[in-house]
């Protein structure tokens, strides 16, 4: 059920967390600020018409996400995730894809880690305690469901006006044949199988995108090949120190300007969010296979169904978390302070890195070090519906090799929907650039990225 802030205040109880001293430990060194070369303003080609329908994500610039996922940059290792997952005084528990060791950066990881954190909290508490969860994404929803099923009183706080976090479905039957998915919705076959029984049986709620094609300025060309990346990573893992994936490729003699290699790296970035120029070669991002599965339907509504009996406060950003060995106090963005015995924090890594939530006292040094060491990944999605198809290929996954396209991966949903719908995927540093564009420039960049697939004028009619 949904509740107002007034209801929360009435039920908050008289207890409050005592006076807390700021931690006197040194701060971890922040990652150096990266600079990017300004991108020329995109120009849309005439051969690619303006879309009749347009939607896109901007997770990289969203203050409640600051990214789409997480990955390990060169010089870090998976133990950073384990450090961040450690409870603090058995009062604060962290959960989400960034703290999962087995499937980090994925929806499966978010679900599994929510279960881990919920079980840890249940073990540390009794059924008289008041519990809260910060963040109503997949991890927050799953944790809330588990705590409620265990007989606990739990309140779920979400900064946005809707639940789902970085899962975002737009249900609009008048504009789209299926709900556009702006967040996490693409899964490998293994992840799809893993989610069955964990979250929902997705067998009848997914599309199998399993035919791929690669195009350059001359037309269709050879498909992508992940072998050069795998070979470079294998050699890099035998070296004395870690290196970024692109550095490992260069050391192995690869030409980073090769269009086919650039397309392969863009495909990896679009599916993992990892920037190849920063990602670890010792613990590299997974190179996706030739196919993926796309989850369809209103995922927001499905997550909402899991919250029956849970108090949910949307449009309630948590600005400050004060804690000691007696409990936790949450201060909302409007100034209200609410007291709880224990809290699970599922805020995205990017929010923690940008200090979107103040902790008092500061988190332990190991937690702050882990937050600084991990990297936020970026994935943006652009949905485009056209009045009629301007392309000839029937493949469902398109790759762009060569040229200066900002979006190098496209999904063709026309074979499934019967309508000319394309979905652009962009990851890593290019996703950051795309998120920062105005709507006009983002649309132009998307159209320009499709130029290779447009049928030549003399082939039309």
Region roles according to the model:
Residues 1-461:
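FAD-dinucleotide binding site
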């Amino acid at each position: 059920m949904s509740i107002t802030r007034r209801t929360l205040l009435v039920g908050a109880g008289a207890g409050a967390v005592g006076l807390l001293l700021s931690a006197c430990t040194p701060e971890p060194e922040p990652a150096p600020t990266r600079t990017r070369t300004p991108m020329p303003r995109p120009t849309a080609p005439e051969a690619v018409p303006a879309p009749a329908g347009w939607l896109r994500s901007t997770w990289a610039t969203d203050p409640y996400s600051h990214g789409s996922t997480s990955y390990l940059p060169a010089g870090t290792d998976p133990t950073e995730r384990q450090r961040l997952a450690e409870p603090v005084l058995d009062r604060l528990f962290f959960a989400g894809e960034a703290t999962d060791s087995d499937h980090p950066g994925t929806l499966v990881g978010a679900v599994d880690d929510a279960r881990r954190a919920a079980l840890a909290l249940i073990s540390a508490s009794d059924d008289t305690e008041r519990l809260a969860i910060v963040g109503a994404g997949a991890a927050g929803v799953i944790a809330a469901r588990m705590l409620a099923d265990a007989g606990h009183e739990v309140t779920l706080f979400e900064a946005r006006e809707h639940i789902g976090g970085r899962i975002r479905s737009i249900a609009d039957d008048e504009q789209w044949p299926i709900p556009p998915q702006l967040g996490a919705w693409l899964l490998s076959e293994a992840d799809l199988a893993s989610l069955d029984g964990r979250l929902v049986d997705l067998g009848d709620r997914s599309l199998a995108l399993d035919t791929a094609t690669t195009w350059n300025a001359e037309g269709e060309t050879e498909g992508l090949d992940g072998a050069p990346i795998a070979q470079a990573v294998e050699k890099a893992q035998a070296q004395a120190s870690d290196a970024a994936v692109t550095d490992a490729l260069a050391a192995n003699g690869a030409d980073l300007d090769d269009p086919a290699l650039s397309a392969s790296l863009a495909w990896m970035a679009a599916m993992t969010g990892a920037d190849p120029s920063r990602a670890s070669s010792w613990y590299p991002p997974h190179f996706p296979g030739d196919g993926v599965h796309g989850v369809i339907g209103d995922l927001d509504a499905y997550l909402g169904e899991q919250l029956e009996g849970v108090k949910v406060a949307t449009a309630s950003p948590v600005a400050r978390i004060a804690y000691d060995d007696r409990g936790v106090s949450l201060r909302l963005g409007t100034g209200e302070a609410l007291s709880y015995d224990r809290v699970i924090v599922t805020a995205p890594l990017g929010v923690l890195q940008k200090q979107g939530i103040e902790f008092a006292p500061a988190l332990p040094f190991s937690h702050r070090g882990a937050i600084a060491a991990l990297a936020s990944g970026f994935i943006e999605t652009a949905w485009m519906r056209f009045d009629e198809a301007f392309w000839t290929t029937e493949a469902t996954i398109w790759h762009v090799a060569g040229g200066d396209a900002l979006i190098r991966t496209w999904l063709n949903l026309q074979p499934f929907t019967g309508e000319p719908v394309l979905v652009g995927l962009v990851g890593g540093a290019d996703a950051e650039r795309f998120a920062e564009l105005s709507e006009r420039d983002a649309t132009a960049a998307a159209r320009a990225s499709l130029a290779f697939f447009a049928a030549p004028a003399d082939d039309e009619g």
